[in-house]
Structures are given as C-alpha cells and as structure tokens.
A protein has these predicted regions:
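Enzyme catalytic cores with a strong preference for nitrogen-chemistry domains
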Residues: 1-263
Length: 263
C-alpha cells in the first residue's frame, strides 16, 4: 500500500486567519486531486508564526478556532483526506477558585469535517528569537493517527530536538514521524536541522518528514527546504529553499519507507 503525502510548504501571514485558512483549503484540494491523502502544514499555520502578544488575546484564539473549523468544514467532502493544521488553542481551568487560561501550541488532524486528534507541543523553546513559554503551556500527550493503514506520529518543531517525544510516539505505535515546523533561518541552520533530525530517525528507527514554513515575519526568516529522512537517517529528498511549494512524498508498506513522489 502506498500513501501519498503533501507537504504544504507555504508562506502564512501572522494575524490573517481567514487568508491562511483559505490557503490551507486551496492547497489541500489541489493535493487531494493529485492523489494525496495526508497534507502537512507548518507550525501555527492557521495564525502565522510568531504571533507573539496577539496570542494573549482571547479573541485572537477564538478567531483561530473559527478558522480551523472553516478548514474542517470546507474539506469535509474529501473522503479519507487527513490534514494536519498548526494552531494555538486554549482551555480554562480553575486553581483555588481562580480562573486560569492555558494556551497550547497545537496541531489538529482534520478528516471529513472532524478533528480526529489534537496534539500540544511538549518542548517550548525560550532562547534567541523564541519566547514560547511566555505564551504557551507545555503539552503532555502523544499523538499517533492512522492514514491508509500507516501509523503517523505527530511532533511540533522543538519536540524533535529532544529524544523523548519521538520515543513516546514510537512506543504508541508510530511507524513514521511527521514534524511540523517554523524554524528560523541562519547561515548553516539547514545542515544543523538535518543532522539533528537524522539522530531522531536513527534513535527511533523511523523515517521522518520535516515539514517547514517559508517566508518572513519582521526579522525572522523561514527558508522552507522541507525534507524527508529514511529510518537509516539518509536524506531521501528535499523541497525547494526560500520558495512556496506543494511537495509530494510517498510512504510505502509493508516496511514503511518514505521518498519523494515520482512525477
């Protein structure tokens, strides 16, 4: 069995939830028409990255949720299509009768109008241009979902720079790791990413898809160059640098391997 996957390496605009949702819908419909049954969008694709203090506004989180629902509704008729969308989410709780708002850097798996799974990023970077601990609470869960018989483990960016999240996904049954990202560029960063993800693939014994953002926000630049690694850590293929692209891959069973789709 072959699963065709589309990495939607696109430029999402901070604060334009409606426009970002339409971009995801359009890309997903195009990918579906070309045979893809799994679409991966970057980290926080619904609102753009980094959204910074906009994330502190309840109305902003609500607008993100509305946009996510729009994506789910518009793609509901596409049978068996799973779309991974990065988004912020919030939940209210009470501690000693005091209301506490917790926000998460999350990703949801949308399929036929429903949210099959929602995963919250476990590892929150707080260095250099990152200040995610200001906005988000670390997640504690694991997300493994099935598409056409293949169990996909979902990670978000910094999760893949640590060993534990990948191992937890494998222990939960993952046969393939899908990592959605918004990783700022600097000279040499591409090689650093590949080397760290190679260690993740080797440590888990699983192939790994690195789905990246492209474009810029203020002084932060995202270089695209999404890639896929085999379970042996070998680079199997890479998308364009500094350009939007719908990049297609194929995952094959019974022994799960992933490589660029043949055009």
């Amino acid at each position: 069995m072959t699963l065709k996957i589309c990495v939607a390496q696109l430029n999402f605009t901070v604060g334009d939830m409606s426009g970002n949702a339409q971009k995801i819908i359009s890309a997903s419909k195009t990918a579906y028409a070309q045979g893809a049954r799994l679409v991966l969008t970057p980290e926080l694709s619904i609102c753009g990255y980094p959204a910074e203090d906009l994330l502190l506004r309840p109305a902003f989180i609500a607008a993100c949720d509305d946009a996510l629902n729009t994506v789910a509704t518009e793609l509901a008729s596409l049978k068996d299509l799973a779309v991974v969308v990065g988004h912020p989410t919030g939940s209210d709780s009470r501690t000693k009768s005091v209301a506490v708002q917790r926000r998460y850097n999350a990703a949801s798996v949308l399929c036929e109008g429903r949210r099959l799974e929602t995963y919250a990023k476990r590892e929150l970077p707080n260095y250099q241009v990152f200040d995610e601990r200001r906005y988000f609470t670390p997640g504690q869960g694991v997300c493994v979902f099935q598409v056409q018989g293949i169990n996909v483990g979902l990670l978000i960016c910094e999760d893949a720079w640590f060993d534990e999240p990948g191992h937890l996904a494998k222990d939960a049954g993952a046969e393939l790791l899908a990592v959605i990202n918004a990783s700022p560029y600097h000279v040499g960063k591409g090689g650093e990413r590949i080397e760290r993800m190679r260690q993740g693939a080797l440590n888990t014994g699983l192939p790994l898809i690195y789905a990246h953002n492209v474009g810029a926000q203020d002084e932060v630049v995202f270089d695209g160059a999404s890639f896929v690694l085999g379970a042996d850590g070998a680079l199997a293929g890479q998308a364009s640098s500094f350009a939007e692209e719908l990049w297609f891959l194929e995952a094959n069973r019974p022994e799960t391997g992933v490589e660029p789709a043949q055009s």
